[in-house]
Each structure stands twice: as C-alpha cells, then as structure tokens.
Amino acid sequence: MVDVSDKVETKRTAVAEGRVVMRPETLALVIAGRAGKGDVLGIARVAGIMAAKRTADPKNSKSFSRVLLERPRAHSI
C-alpha cells in the first residue's frame, strides 16, 4: 500500500536558462518594444512564469524569480 499521508513541506529550487540569438536589427526592435509581433519580452516573461508554475497548480507567482538579460554584443536575449 502507498503512504499518501501529509508530508513535511520542503523548499525546492530550480534554475533554467535559454538563449535566443537574432540579427542585431531584430534585437534592437525587441529591446525597444517595437517588434512587429508586439511586446516580445513581456510575452517571454509570462511564458516563463506559466512554465515554471505549471498554471494548473495553485502557486503564488511571487515565489518565482525571473530575469531577462539583454546581450547586444552577442545579438541575444
């Protein structure tokens, strides 16, 4: 039989990283918020939060830290 009783709450940490490389002109538009598809960085932030918290699970989004770094010399975010 499987024990399904309450368990002690634990703190867990996960780290994920990704990089999107693009032409310098495209990167400039994305950073300036003038890309033809709208607010690319805003959508990326929301997508990251949704993936991290698995939207069906009740979790407070304040428990997540997210950072988007602009790297113009590498033509990436």
UniProtKB/Swiss-Prot annotation:
It comes from Rhodobacter capsulatus (Rhodopseudomonas capsulata). Keywords: Lyase, Molybdenum cofactor biosynthesis. It is an enzyme of class 4 (lyase). This is Cyclic pyranopterin monophosphate synthase. One of its GO terms (biological process) is Mo-molybdopterin cofactor biosynthetic process. InterPro entries: MoaC_sf (IPR036522), Mopterin_CF_biosynth-C_dom (IPR002820). GO terms for molecular function: cyclic pyranopterin monophosphate synthase activity. Catalyzes the conversion of (8S)-3',8-cyclo-7,8-dihydroguanosine 5'-triphosphate to cyclic pyranopterin monophosphate (cPMP). Seems to be specific for the biogenesis of DMSO reductase. The lineage of its organism: Bacteria, Pseudomonadati, Pseudomonadota, Alphaproteobacteria, Rhodobacterales. Belongs to the MoaC family. The gene is moaC. Pathway: Cofactor biosynthesis; molybdopterin biosynthesis. It catalyses: (8S)-3',8-cyclo-7,8-dihydroguanosine 5'-triphosphate = cyclic pyranopterin phosphate + diphosphate. It holds the Pfam family MoaC. Homohexamer; trimer of dimers. Its EC number is 4.6.1.17. The keyword Lyase applies.
